[in-house]
């Protein structure tokens, strides 16, 4: 009896050890080549690539996670995974013509599939496997080596997995198990990649879109396995802190849009001589139940962010020298977002450069970490309060390990008569603005409403977007009609009324006491009808109301939607300095 206890005590740990070792044991990274076919294996993960630069097998725990792939019937790539492509007047496949082994040691194997001349862009697709990491690091270098500009609507990596196994999508905010393409394509189609389900509800692949820089990871999971996109930094994505894109969607697809125009970002125009390194990011594979998978990838994401910039990457185009940029923005806004943009484009629609952003504390202080040396344009805008538009903008040079900018004086706000909403380039505070992305919300907004300053409530009486032709009225009183005022309208998004033909573009007639002041017209940012609830492409309008335009006592601003849809950030009436 006493002898059995020690035997039993030893037996359980031994059994546990035997079970765990295959999952955690690691060894040297091995590379096998057969022409342009390659296999990378570190004992935790084994990935075999074909000559076209896409994965043919992904082995984890004895299971090939891409053995059964699926997609839209019309998609020629529905049976491919881990591939790179771009859209420039049509889909352009990445067609590598050579494979380079850049580094091969027991700790790291670094390969690059390179397309020098088969497409409009010169592309390098780099694959890096390291010891002890159950995943594959990747980065892309895109260049225009031609003599004419190249317009690119999207440049992306697509990771497709077995949807019968990894059946759950997770975009870091919401999770779900949507129908697959072969089922969806039998249902009535509402619009682009949007279907009406048998229960009357609507599903769209855009339901699982998200804010790229806010999302630390996104992926697919199920039946004991998870696959995750883990970007250690978002500095190389297009747009700004509010850049949205597709992240995951049905058929177990993980997307990494290096640039994309689904939600207001314009097409990238790569001028001759353009070259940009995107990444690296980690495609991480793990095992466990759903809770364990998410907890594990969350820890992994924190580790990757803490390791940025990666010291193990030796590429002259990847700056490992970085600086911390700090300063203090003197502003009356409760908080502000401070942005550094390396390109000459407006920061919120930039596509060719790198972008860094940080939120000020209540004292106005900010710090941006890991900024490469160089010249940047600094822009700041309110993240709360009522001051619409840029607070400050200037050119800064980043040098050394620390760049201290000192105090930056923000534009002084004009005296405020009233405000609807918070000036933060988002519509969260309005009705439905806190809802998850879903097509239905745009159909539930009234065509006409009346909002009374001082009585109505933003959360209940003002909606995230004006989506139906009609008039929204703002009633307010003034005791000083002789004072000149400015009506400030910040638009968080402006979209067509859908993808039907013909579609109406966003047009908003602005009236004061029944008299037309102006008609605001915008290009289609494609955001609202694709389920965006907080933002798209930002616009602002400042409409002067000359002295005497207002009436003593009651006044009415009318916003008449003539076409398309508009999403509101904030509306204010301010005194015009004399």
From Swiss-Prot:
Residues 1-27 form the signal peptide. It catalyses: Endotype eliminative cleavage of L-alpha-rhamnopyranosyl-(1->4)-alpha-D-galactopyranosyluronic acid bonds of rhamnogalacturonan I domains in ramified hairy regions of pectin leaving L-rhamnopyranose at the reducing end and 4-deoxy-4,5-unsaturated D-galactopyranosyluronic acid at the non-reducing end. Optimum pH is 6.0. It is an enzyme of class 4 (lyase). Its EC number is 4.2.2.23. Degrades the rhamnogalacturonan I (RG-I) backbone of pectin. Is required for the full virulence of E.chrysanthemi strain 3937 as it is involved in rotting of plant tissue. One of its GO terms (molecular function) is carbohydrate binding. It comes from the Bacteria. SUPFAM superfamilies: Galactose mutarotase-like (SSF74650), Galactose-binding domain-like (SSF49785), Starch-binding domain-like (SSF49452). Induction: By rhamnose. It is found in: Secreted. Pfam families: CBM-like (PF14683), fn3_3 (PF14686). Keywords: Lyase, Secreted, Signal, Virulence. Contrary to other proteins secreted by the Out pathway, RhiE contains no disulfide bond. Belongs to the polysaccharide lyase 4 family. CDD domains: RGL4_C, RGL4_M, RGL4_N. GO terms for cellular component: extracellular region. This is Rhamnogalacturonate lyase. It comes from Dickeya dadantii (strain 3937). GO terms for biological process: carbohydrate metabolic process.
